[in-house]
Curated annotation (Swiss-Prot):
GO terms for biological process: intracellular protein transmembrane transport; protein import; protein targeting. GO terms for cellular component: chloroplast stroma; chloroplast thylakoid membrane. Has a central role in coupling the hydrolysis of ATP to the transfer of proteins across the thylakoid membrane. Transmembrane segments: none annotated. It comes from Cyanidioschyzon merolae (strain NIES-3377 / 10D) (Unicellular red alga). This is Protein translocase subunit SecA.
Amino acid sequence: MKNKLRQIKENREKYRKLKEEELREKTKQLKERAKQESLEELMVEAYSNVWEGAARVLKLEAYDVQLIGAMVLNKGQIAEMKTGEGKSLVAAFASYLNALSGKGVHIVTVNDYLAKRDERWIGEVLRYLGLKTAVITNESSREERKKGYEADVTYITNSELGFDYLRDHMAWSKEEIVQREFNYCIIDEVDSILIDEARTPLIISGPTKGSEKPYKVAWEIGKRMKEGEDYELEEKSKQVILKEKGIKRCEEALEVKDIFSMETPWAHYVMNAIKAKHFYIKDVNYIIKEGEVVIVDEFTGRIMGGRRWADGLHQAIEAKEGVKIQEESETLASITYQNLFLLYPKLAGMTGTAKTEEEEFEQIYGLKVVSIPTHRKMKRKDYPDVVYRTSRSKWMAVAEECERMWTKGRPVLVGTTSIEKSELLARLLEEKGVKYKLLNARPSLAADEASIIAQAGKIGSITIATNMAGRGTDIILGGNIKEAFGEWIKERKKQVDIEEEWRKVLEGKADEESEKKYKQLKEEHEKEQKRVKQLGGLYVIGTERHESRRIDNQLRGRSGRQGDEGSSRFFISLEDDLLRIFGGGQMGEIMSRLGVEEPLESAFLSKSLDRAQKKVENYYYQMRKQLFEYDQVLNSQRKAIYKERTDILRSEEVGEWSKSYIRKEWPGGLLGIKRGMRNRSEVEISYDVKKMQMESVQAGLMNELERLLLLQQIDKSWSKHLKEMSLLREFIAWRGYAQRDPLVEYKNESYNLFIKMIEEIRQGYAYSLFRSQA
């Protein structure tokens, strides 16, 4: 890499002398050469071009470490780069190089705000060099999506990408398909998408006729059942295990013989009710908004509008809360992020925290993690954890620490794990008269997320935020001049393009008043930044160790960006979830036996905390690995069905498919022919008769009817199959208690279900075709 870096730096000097049109011409030449040469051979010239483009358009000079990061991305690896090291610019180099093939590049971000920001900001460099860029958001129309995927570089969120993939495989005509074949993808915050969200499948569902009654009945039974007597809980995996007494109690209450029957799966309803009772807590896992249960993302703390828990769990929570129970949805299509991103021939990622999960990235995705050194030396001090015996004493200590810092004027960012806890701290600070900004999933607060986080580095700023809220937005010591200028310009002009006004200011092309305001803000910012640095920079307080050291490191990483001063400390208690579930009881015993005063700092406790956290990390890794193993079974079936469906959709003539399906499921009974008389000529004759009938009405009608009925039958049977696979997955775990390997059982039974589905598709299609009337 050092040799390549030296070549790029030497070559870049030539590019300084080139005119804008000459840089664009370079892009055209490189595109032509990409047809014959490898991207590795084009890298030196491509990266030199982007470097010069960024210097001219954004006034940004790339650092050596950014160029190294870009080389890592081009290799199809993960570049671990700390907060504030300029990952967005790094992606510009690798995306430009890989776009030269003409096959398209996707840059995937965690939210629409970041996708729009990067396409507008970094995308300007790519457009300057002659590439086409596009952004696809939640609001994009089908036409905009289609055009967006045709661009050289497309900025998009992981969920939009996944749902477009699923919708394309439910399309009824070629014109409805928006995506082209996947080529190269760079995932920003790759750990958030490929690890934190790996357990949550993307689901497209449709309403199904169902009754509210089973959920209400199951809730009434579930809330009266007793833990330990009727059921046991596996808190780590959020699983419910019904005991013999509990099963009998359910069967008596419901007056059924077997609650595990596939025909009347009452066990499914009751276990969901018990899960809703114990594991899904209001203002932690969800909020009630306008009479609806709305999910709160456990990793980002944001509400997930439009998303619902699958398999009847959402309805169970609605029954618990006494709100309107919405119709249970029928899964029409689904895919996990694990399998979605494995569809790319070449995949890369960026994040500030990946090294702790490098085994998982390597094992599941085949992605190597490469740590990129920081441009400036890290100055942040990470202090040892302070441990309290009770949660109450911990929160009092956090509030006191915030008050102490607020009095000094030092900015503080406090990370909490839920809405409930963020509001608890807010109340404690109010009692002390400490001013703060609160950021959590409540809609009234979430709207200002980016601006609140951007100004969290100002003097006297106390910001309480759930989990990873504001990730992707830099916290600049002394505040963010751009945000402050944006607020001022909005007050001055009602209809204003802030990005355009900001660009004019940077280029010295703004009006006199704007130039004057910018100068004033810059002077104020420099003074404030100096003062904040003297106070020690941003102080990050963690209020709970997370299930992964990586998430703790993300919170710490909000401080000390680009060599800034800063510090972090975690305040934790033995009542926190991590310690309670994975070993807090043992430490509580030791502390009470030793009669230790609160609070406590010790090497022994820190090691115990690390051990507990590693245990959790390994536990969840094994869960994700198991999910991946099970999902591979469904994934191979999905690939087969989607290939068949796509081939039918894209084919000009579908007659051969039609005949193939009919031969295997000849519905002779419909024509008064005995089953035993089936032969090839009968099939051909009957098919030709049907075709003549249809063609006599309209030329090409038979072909379109066949296509429609084939797609219809595939979709109907696939949706039914997904439901059966979901039930099988839920009940198969019980085989483990009978000393049988659940995964082997799942593979065997899912194969039988798949064969049954194929037969249903053929049979259903054959009958539909011969029953159809012109």
